[in-house]
């Protein structure tokens, strides 16, 4: 094995750096607690408090990392100007312009994640799988908005954007109905991916969830669900 050649090839494969590692998944669009069973508290000492601090920290981190990189942004890291605000179902590319400028200046691509947690419209721990139609519709519209934002990222950087669909939907106890939430979840993802996009430039994918705080017994988007959905929808997602 030519190890030098192997290392050189690896150096050319971009690794996507998660912006949310810089502030313990707090984000900039809300002041409430973190939800979704994620294993953080939002209280890490020394975390970035503003977009400027987060970007400066990312610059420092990237200066210490070898190889090609991309920036991975969560929807809750929208940057609003002059007191403006858009809820997650109304997010637009302009709310992420500073991230686009940051990436373009460094010759990097952007990946994206809808944020299906830490929001007052997470009802009974559910979003895309909620039996409440109003709740489910809100989160479907959020997913569609994120497809449009991902398209903008790809257009602006000239680099394909991977859009990762992950939710914390689930229950602390084993539910009587384990099929219903997954049927609704599938229908919701189908509807999100009905939003037009160029599959060469926008690469949707579905990520599974194992378990989390308060979601110990049942997760809707299990590994089996995510793998099966991706296998059955190869033309639409990774």
Question: What is each PLM-predicted segment?
Answer:
Residues 135-136, 175:
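Generic detector of solvent-exposed, compositionally biased contiguous segments
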Residues 141-142:
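Active-site-proximal beta-alpha core segment in soluble small-molecule metabolic enzymes
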Residues 1-131, 138, 148, 155, ...:
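Alpha/beta catalytic barrel-like cores
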Residues 172-238:
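Acidic/histidine-rich catalytic cores of soluble enzymes
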Residues 147-177, 202-205:
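Active-site groove signature of glycoside hydrolases
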Residues 114-116, 169-171, 210:
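Short, flexible active-site-adjacent loop segments at beta-strand->alpha-helix junctions, enriched
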Residues 75, 167, 206-210:
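A general secondary-structure junction signal
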């Amino acid at each position: 094995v030519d190890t030098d050649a192997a290392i050189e090839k690896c150096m050319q494969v971009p690794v996507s750096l998660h912006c949310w590692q810089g502030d313990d998944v707090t984000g900039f669009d809300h002041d409430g607690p973190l939800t979704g069973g994620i294993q953080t508290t939002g209280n890490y000492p020394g975390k970035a408090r503003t977009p400027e601090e987060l970007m400066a920290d990312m610059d420092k981190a990237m200066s210490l990392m070898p190889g090609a990189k991309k920036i991975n942004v969560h929807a809750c890291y929208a940057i609003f100007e002059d007191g403006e605000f858009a809820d997650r179902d109304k997010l637009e590319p302009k709310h992420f312009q500073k991230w686009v400028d940051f990436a373009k200046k460094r010759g990097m691509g952007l990946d994206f994640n809808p944020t299906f947690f830490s929001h007052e419209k997470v009802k009974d721990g559910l979003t895309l799988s909620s039996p409440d139609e109003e709740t489910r519709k809100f989160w479907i519209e959020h997913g569609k908005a994120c497809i449009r934002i991902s398209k903008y990222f790809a257009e602006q950087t000239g680099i394909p954007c991977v859009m990762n669909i992950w939710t914390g939907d689930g229950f602390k106890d084993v539910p009587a109905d384990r099929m219903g939430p997954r049927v609704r979840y599938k229908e919701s993802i189908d509807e999100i991916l009905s939003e037009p996009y160029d599959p060469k430039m926008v690469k949707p994918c579905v990520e599974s969830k194992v378990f989390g705080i308060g979601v110990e017994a049942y997760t809707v988007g299990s590994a089996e669900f995510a793998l099966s959905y991706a296998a059955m929808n190869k033309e639409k997602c990774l």
